Regions:
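Short beta->alpha transition motifs characteristic of CBS
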Residues: 97, 103, 114-121
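Core segments of cupin and vicinal oxygen chelate
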Residues: 13-50
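N-terminal beta-strand motif that seeds the catalytic metal site of vicinal oxygen chelate
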Residues: 1-20, 62, 118-132
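Long, continuous compositionally biased terminal/linker segments
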Residues: 2, 39, 44-82, 88
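Short glycine-enriched loop/turn motifs at secondary-structure junctions
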Residues: 6-8, 55-58, 96
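Vicinal oxygen chelate
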Residues: 17-21, 64-108
Length: 132
């Protein structure tokens, strides 16, 4: 079985009822993963993730991949410290051998997963798109 990243999902758009709380949460959680994040007055943008304000928040499951188990632990703790709520401490899951993940609810109740897939062979770290 092969898993491919970067060919199915173009972007994820989350709506938040509290943009300032979302900014704190995602700045902390994604900062640990060394993902560049743009924090603007009216949005948060990090690679395929776009977050802006709305009257109703989104309710989705969103998983961020990491390079190792220590990053899962660190991102999970950072998310908790920034207002996330525990939805499953980091640990082995039964999804496939080596699947190590922690789960948090963000300030709007979205189920945020931080995952390391264990030993896996990658053809590339990511696909890079440039415009203009």
């Amino acid at each position: 079985m092969e898993l491919h990243r970067g060919r199915l999902i173009d972007h994820v758009h989350l709506r938040t009822r509290d943009l300032e709380a979302a900014k704190r949460f995602y700045r902390a959680a994604l900062g640990v993963l060394d993902i560049p994040i743009e924090i603007a007055d009216d949005h948060v943008w990090a690679d395929e993730l776009w977050i802006d304000a709305g009257e109703q928040g989104s309710h989705v499951h969103l998983a961020f991949q990491t390079g190792d188990r220590a990053m899962v632990d660190k991102a999970w703790r950072a998310g908790l410290a920034a207002g996330g709520k525990d939805n499953g401490a980091p640990g082995e899951r039964k999804y496939h051998p080596g699947y190590y993940a922690g789960f948090l609810f963000d300030p709007d109740g979205n189920n945020i997963e931080v995952v390391h897939h264990g030993p896996a062979e990658r053809s590339a770290a990511s696909v890079k798109l440039t415009f203009g």
